[in-house]
């Protein structure tokens, strides 16, 4: 691993909570990234952090058994859906409202905690529309992130 290369946008089967998006098992995805010689990989499922614990445990297990894994970087993230403030099932207009996809990557444990909190808030505001669970992260979240709250 002389040159650093990280794959920063990857989905696992945990992304399938709302629709079928990926067949990647967490362990298989991480193992394959290592076998390809990547320096690390980010887990950025669709508005879920469910795979993070499994990913952390897998990498820790590999590091404990194999020195070659010591520099492999696991990056924890989330693909959020940014939308207008206060969007809900009553005021949602499929012709006007957009859910912009943004990738968030945690640089440390504080960042990972913030991502988990954002995901929780998004699910607290989620709603069903046209057989799809909408999981909004409101634009106003930018101020919260900048202020660290």
Q: Model regions: which residues?
A:
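Phosphodiester-processing cores and adjacent nucleic acid-binding clamps
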Residues: 1-149
């Amino acid at each position: 691993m002389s040159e650093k290369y990280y794959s920063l946008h990857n989905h696992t089967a945990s992304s399938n909570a709302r629709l079928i998006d990926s067949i990647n098992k967490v362990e298989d995805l991480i193992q394959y990234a290592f076998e390809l010689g990547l320096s690390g990989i980010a887990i950025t499922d669709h508005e879920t952090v469910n795979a993070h614990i499994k990913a952390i445990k897998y990498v820790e297990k590999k590091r404990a058994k194999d020195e070659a894994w010591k520099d492999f970087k696991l990056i924890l993230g989330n693909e959020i859906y940014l939308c207008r403030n206060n969007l809900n099932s009553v005021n949602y207009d499929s012709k006007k409202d957009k859910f912009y996809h943004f990738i968030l990557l945690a640089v440390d444990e504080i960042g990972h905690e913030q991502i988990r909190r954002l995901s929780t808030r998004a699910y607290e505001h989620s709603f069903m529309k046209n057989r799809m669970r909408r999981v909004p992260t409101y634009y106003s979240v930018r101020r919260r992130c900048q202020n660290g709250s």
